[in-house]
Amino acid sequence: MLEGIVQIGRALLENKSLIDNLIKELPTTDKKGNPYHVLKLKFSEENLELDVSEEMDSDTVKKYLYIGTADGPNSPQWYASNHKITYFLSETLFNLTNIDFGEPLNQKLKHIFEKFYIDLGSDIKSKYRYALDLSYLDPNVNVRKLYEEYSEQNKGDNKEFLKVLEKEFEKILIKNYGTKLSEFGLFVIYIDGEPLSKYEEYKQKVLKYKSSSKKRKTSSKKENRKDLRCNICGSTENLTDDLKKMKIKYYTNDKITFASELDKNKFYKNMVICQNCLNAILAAETYLDNKLKTKLGDLDLYIFPHFIYGEPLDKSELDLVVDKIINSYNIVKNLKSVKEFEEKIFGITDENRYFLVNFMFFKKSQQATKIRRFIKDVPLFIFNKIAGASKNAREIVEKAIQMNYETYIDLQKIYYLIPVKINAREVTEYKYILDFYENLLTFKPIEKETLIGKFIEAAKVIYLQKNGYNIKKDSLEFYILNSNMLVKFLEKMGNLKGGNTLDTSKLNVKEDIKNYISTMGYDEQQSAMFLLGVLIGEIGNSQYKKYNSDKKPILNKLNFNGIDKSKIIKLANEVFAKLEQEKIRKYHEKTYADMKRLLDENLENWKLNKNENLFYILSGYSYATIKTIMKGETENE
């Protein structure tokens, strides 16, 4: 894992300094394309002014040395540029006065803090104790009075007072400048007409803070420092086992059960790293956020190369490779057509280098990045393989339903076919979906029974309109059709094996139904359930016309927890009665007869489980319903 990241970092540091490589990108426009602005808090000896005139561009983050926030959830925030105003209204200036920048900068910062900030009380944590005196921007605003009124109603909760400050600050912006906080993408501190981030003393402190780690000390006389080597490059110089500067949590080093010999002083045996490799990792982590971060549904992930040979010499070569990887990934993530893929797919290999692709699913929490799943050494041809399998699966479904079907299986579509529990767009149950992606990308087998169980879980979400899932609750029949397409896709990818297909020449059903069964490769038991589902679909179509409503009472006969073998005969008899009741039995007698024959011949040796029974019943229901929908659309054209 770390080897690929260090390779990236080394290329980045070849032509640029570490501090330049720590600069984070920010959006320069809002969702409507309007440019964000820079809000400058301009402190001088006697005055505080706001400047809102500068528009952001791609160089703004470099100009103001934007490197994000200080490491750790409770770390003092002292950086002079930030994407939110909050810290500048409270703790930043106080924290700056606690850093030794040398004179005259120390004196300037102390003067600004003492003049322009109010002490709200010694009993308050330093993080929330101080507040910018907004009367310098609007004489009608009394911050101390605001705090007194707030604290009377919210005793002990000083953190929330920051929201009150923000609201008052925004009122000043609206009143004096006609702008809102949402119109700014970056906030910066100026001192005597210059951005604090341009002061050389400030830059040096940032660099020292970001890169310095505690040097490894021997824990006993027996331990020979010369025996320690960097786990990445083998160096014996400038070693550390302090990994706190890394944003991504590669190793657990805060729980005693993960320490060597269960000794808290022996975490160093898990991971020791030299300063050069640490710098490379820090540079690469910023690059991951800037260039290699993407989403798959509600899942966050990084995609990055691991060079087997031919490492990039510098950032320009690295950018070239990375752009090709990300562009190829984005196409198979949202595959609109295979033709598009064939036109846009990039040749991402050459004779001078060979690399594999790593997928790192992660979650950011409290400024730490925890790895949820690391899928390593994925071959480059995976993108072509996915596009080809998607094309084949779509062709199979189109042949099966004998209609044009403008849907492809891609990485994003898969996410919305497999039920995942979510809360406020945060994935809370992710093991199966990550297992699935790992097996898909590494060509490992996927268990069909478990997958069909997930399809049934999703069908239940749709039918019962359950909340808290990633599944779109619109169309059960199209969901089931797409699930069948996913099965064919996985067969083409090699993750699933196909079974023995029923000889449809022995069936008396309509030719279009025979065609569907043979094209989808259903066996006898699957076909029996499919035909039962077709009959349920036809009853549903009749009920839809009769009641002129989306509600189809026949679906109440289905148990969405699964249908076991003992309930199949009962369901078949109920379907027969409903065909009579709807007065459509004469149109579907052959279908019922074939279903009953296949059922009777296989019942003693029935192999399908309750979820598989329901899935193939729903597949038949889906087919009958979609054929009617498509026919209606064609007639209306």
Task: Give the location of each predicted region.
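Short cysteine/histidine-rich metal-coordination sites, predominantly Zn2+-binding motifs
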Residues: 245-256, 289-300
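Short beta-strand-alpha-helix junction that forms the catalytic/metal-binding core
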Residues: 260-279
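Short cysteine-rich clusters marking metal-coordination/redox-active sites
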Residues: 230-234, 274-277
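Short Cys/His-rich Zn2+-coordinating modules
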Residues: 198-219, 252-260
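Short functional micro-motifs and their immediate structural scaffolds
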Residues: 237-239, 279-282
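Residues immediately within or flanking Cys/His clusters that coordinate Zn2+
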Residues: 224-228, 236, 271
